[in-house]
A protein has these predicted regions:
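Sequence-structural signature of mature extracellular/luminal beta-sheet repeat domains
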Residues: 1-149
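Cysteine-cluster motifs in flexible loop/terminal segments that predominantly coordinate metals
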Residues: 152
């Protein structure tokens, strides 16, 4: 059995734990930066632009049927340096809750931070269905030696 290997081309550097890439029609890519606590646009030439500073730990993004960017925010993580990279560890001391945010231009609002009386812990990724509803995952938090697990 043989595997194809891809040739990678680095477009930009210096992102702070990027996740949730969303390709844009203009050739740019939106990424959330968990450690950077923001939504960033990376242009085809590698230039980076901060779209919105969201706080917490933005962890996944999708374009909604209304054209806005919807973000799963895990509420933040502590990071530890391991050699040249930072690795996420546990819930930070300033953690409040996870949330779902809506970004229009450079402005954002928090749509949800709970569901049926339960706080969102760590929303991770989201997707829109054909009728415009969105689904998201919430994988919980690590608090010291304990893990709080959630669901879709």
């Amino acid at each position: 059995m043989s595997f194809r290997t891809s040739k990678f081309h680095v477009i930009t550097k210096g992102l702070q734990y990027p996740e949730g890439p969303v390709y844009q029609k203009d050739g740019s890519v939106l990424v959330v930066e968990i450690q950077g606590k923001k939504l960033t646009r990376v242009l085809a030439d590698g230039t980076k632009e901060t779209v919105a500073t969201l706080g917490g730990g933005p962890n996944g993004a999708a374009i909604g049927p209304d054209g806005a960017v919807y973000v799963c925010n895990d509420g933040g993580l502590d990071f530890v340096a391991v050699g040249p990279v930072s690795v996420p560890t546990f819930q930070p001391a300033d953690y409040v809750s996870g949330s779902i945010q809506k970004v229009v231009g450079s402005n954002f609002s928090t749509l949800y931070n709970q569901c049926n009386g339960q706080s969102l812990r760590s929303p991770d990724d989201l997707v829109f269905d054909k009728t415009g509803n969105f689904w998201f995952t919430d994988w919980g938090k690590k608090i010291g030696r304990a893990s709080c697990r959630e669901r879709v």
